[in-house]
Amino acid sequence: MIKRRNLLQWLGLSPFFWPLPLSAAENYRLSETFSPGNRFRIQTATELSGSMLFTPPNQPSKQIQIKGKSQIDFDETILTLDSSLKVNKSLREYRKVELSRTLDGQNQETILRPQVRTMVLLRNGSKKIPFSLEAPLTWNELDLIRTEVFPCALAGLFPPRSVALNESWNAGLESVQELTDLEVLESSQVVCKLDSVNLVNNRKTARISFVGKASGINEDGPNQQILDGYIFFDCETRHLSFLYLKGTSILKNKEGKDVGRIEGRYTISREMLPAVQLDTKSIYEPDANNTRLLFESRETSFSFHYPRNWRVTSQSDSQATLDQSKEAGLLITKEKPSRYTSSAMYRDEALAFVRKQQMRIENQSAIEPVNGTPGLEFFSWDVQIEGRRMHLLYFVYRTGQNMFTLASRCSQESKLNLRSDIMMIANSIKPTEKSS
């Protein structure tokens, strides 16, 4: 579906903003170029509504209503370009992020916490990878940023050559994919046209319209989108200064039958700011620490950090499960402190489970403390079951009046890599207010 999450703020123009036409005889070369240190203030807004077919577990399918709106305001500084001179890294400083939606009558809100409002955004092809410099992002924060339009990726809306008024060209596929948020773009018939070049508020400004259809696959499945919009291009600073999009997303099932329809409006207002001088300290790189995610839920009595290649698959008041692959998983349980008076009791219970499953133990470790984390102990076994060689790693963590156990599994071939992931997760567990 179209996931642009901001409320349309202005469509009318104030009296001093009326355009004054220029000569129609010229040819125009309209394109953006970027340099490290370029800065923009960007304000985006979305409003959407519609319905889609939803199938709850073990229940019949039903149509649910969807409404949403959002407003986002941030400064973006260009950090680096790739070999084709496209922006592949930028620094964002958010002033405002507000997203709300109603899904089947349930209200949902997403915000950016103050400690993650400065972040770096990496772009690799159509993928956007944000990470914060101050604290781990939650999955909702990550999803919010990576599904927002990246204005620097809209160069395909500009003509690939010099054009005259009313001349048309096909929109670039990369820009269509950016606007539609399709994970796989299968076809595009989006056409752009230079409508006018006018003096707008005493600045030479080009208006480019775009209209058409695009089809592909997003997280909801097969999808067709209908686009109708326009952009303003500031001919003096040579940057996209405004975008308006009216879009319709038609959701389809595997047979190609329509199962939902969502309509929305999206705007980008973009102002060029004075450039800044970058130093080597400004070229931030992702690493295992700054790309971690934060798991924190009202339903669960603890929080923890985890790598992005892991996925939280279930949660309850006292448990959370994570998967990294088909053969790598982790179960975290908040225990009653009286259940295990020693780590040896937990090890004996785990050993009984291993024997019940008829696993053959090939190697085992003693119970050991984790350096630097008081109250955290671990033990492990290398086992074989049904021809598979697995590594089982367990933790007991006592912190204050709380106790946690962790049980994990992975293949023996991957244990060196995954062991450090699981150790990091265990080290990061913290009881929340709900646990007290």
What is the meaning of each model-derived region?
Residues 145-154:
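Short, structured beta-strand/loop micro-motifs enriched in basic residues and often containing a Trp
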Residues 6-23:
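N-terminal export signals
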Residues 26-28, 153-157:
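Short alpha-helix capping/helix-loop boundary micro-motifs
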Residues 301, 412, 416-420:
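Soluble non-cytosolic domains of exported or imported proteins
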Residues 298-354, 382-386:
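Secretory pathway targeting signatures of secreted, lumenal, and periplasmic proteins
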Residues 24-115, 121, 163, 171-291, ...:
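Acidic, serine/threonine-rich low-complexity disordered tracts
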Residues 349-403:
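Signature of long, low-cysteine stretches enriched in small and polar/charged residues
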Residues 243, 392-393, 402-411, 429:
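Short, well-ordered beta-strand elements
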